[in-house]
């Protein structure tokens, strides 16, 4: 049986979520837009689900939640929709250099529409430089979009401070919270944020469902035109079974997050300590303390991350080198390059992301396999220095 340690890319659907969804596939399957009794039932469950997702982030009004097909659509609707709506006010948008690929490509798309997009830098741990962010804001700035945490190296961003800066400057603030939503609480009444991207699968719900939170008074131009569902901002018949699953996943995650996050942090810390202690020339990417409790992102000198993933695959261990959404390219991680790493350093990375089903025995097995596989690849690498090879020979 394989050991799954790629939870940042995809998570299994919780069995309790699947059980909740079943009824809405073949019994209560009507369209919420229909006027008959079955349509009323679908509308009721849709609005109940909206309330549950709103409660997940402590949103005061369930109408603040728009359902979408997932995080990429929510990012598009939030950033493109807000930018187009505010174009008469200004044409300047700020994102970070280490955003998810969907936000980076949205930035390029908006530049082709005539918007000016600035990309704020990060420090060597992947944390936003707040001083640089403030200096980038002008009278033309209408939107800041910065993720709550890096989906790759796991560094938590100073969301509260960014929110304060945005409020003081009268600029909308959008955050993609997908990387953190399963392990870090979101409270929009404690930290005011204008737009938030959420994903169902990242809290162990079904894929193909997401949401965009819009603070009261904030509106976006629709990017999908049709029947005017979701307050006229996101057309298309709602995916009721998926939304029911999303809502159940939100309910479970909110309740179990404190204990689950602590469990994951203990496993993560055990993994990090043992890897850094037992494998020479190994490094932790991202911030040591301000990081996601389920994220461990390493780099190993003198080897390729892709080769390491393939050797772990031989031992039925699933891990990654970085973001799944850009893993098919052989280019070095844009996040690691932005953090100041050289191309050859960025290529030697391994992302281990833990989840609800991760057990301590999974970590033990990885720690049993990983040192030998790193050693094996280094012996084959022309980059490995002779003194390290000699040490490996001495401990045979």
Residue ranges and their predicted role:
Residues 1-396:
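Pyridoxal 5′-phosphate
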């Amino acid at each position: 049986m394989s050991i799954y340690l790629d939870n940042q890319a995809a998570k299994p659907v919780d069995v309790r979520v699947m059980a909740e969804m079943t009824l809405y596939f073949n019994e209560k399957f009507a369209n919420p837009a229909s006027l008959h009794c079955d349509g009323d039932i679908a509308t009721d469950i849709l609005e109940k689900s909206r309330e549950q997702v709103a409660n997940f982030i402590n949103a005061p009004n369930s109408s603040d939640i728009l359902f979408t097909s997932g995080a990429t659509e929510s990012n598009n609707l939030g950033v493109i929709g807000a930018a187009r709506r505010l174009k008469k006010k200004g044409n300047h948008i700020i994102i970070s250099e280490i955003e998810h690929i969907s936000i980076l490509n949205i930035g390029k798309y908006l530049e082709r529409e005539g918007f000016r997009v600035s990309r704020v830098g990060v420090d060597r741990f992947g944390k936003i430089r707040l001083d640089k962010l403030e200096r980038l804001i002008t009278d033309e700035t209408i939107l800041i979009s910065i993720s709550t945490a890096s989906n790759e190296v796991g560094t938590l961003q100073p969301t509260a401070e960014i929110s304060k800066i945005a409020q003081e400057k009268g600029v909308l603030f959008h955050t993609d919270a997908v990387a953190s939503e399963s392990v870090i609480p979101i409270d929009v009444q404690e930290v005011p944020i204008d737009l938030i991207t959420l994903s169902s699968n990242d809290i162990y719900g079904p894929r193909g469902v997401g949401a965009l939170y819009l603070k009261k008074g904030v509106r976006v131009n629709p990017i999908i035109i049709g029947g005017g569902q979701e307050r006229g901002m996101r057309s298309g018949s709602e995916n009721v079974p998926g939304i029911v699953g999303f809502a159940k996943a939100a309910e479970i995650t909110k309740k179990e997050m404190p204990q689950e996050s602590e469990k994951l942090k203990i496993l993560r810390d055990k993994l990090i300590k043992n890897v850094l202690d037992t494998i020479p020339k190994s490094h932790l990417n991202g911030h040591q303390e301000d990081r996601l409790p389920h994220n461990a992102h390493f780099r190993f000198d003198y080897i390729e991350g892709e080769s390491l993933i393939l050797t772990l695959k031989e031992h039925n261990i699933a891990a990654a080198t970085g973001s799944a959404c850009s893993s098919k390219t052989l280019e070095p991680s844009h996040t690691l390059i932005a953090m100041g790493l050289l191309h050859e350093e960025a290529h030697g990375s391994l992302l281990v992301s833990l989840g609800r089903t991760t057990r301590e025995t999974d970590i033990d097995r990885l720690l049993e396999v990983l040192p030998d596989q790193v050693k094996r690849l280094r012996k084959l690498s022309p980059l490995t220095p002779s003194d390290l090879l000699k040490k490996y020979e001495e401990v045979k």
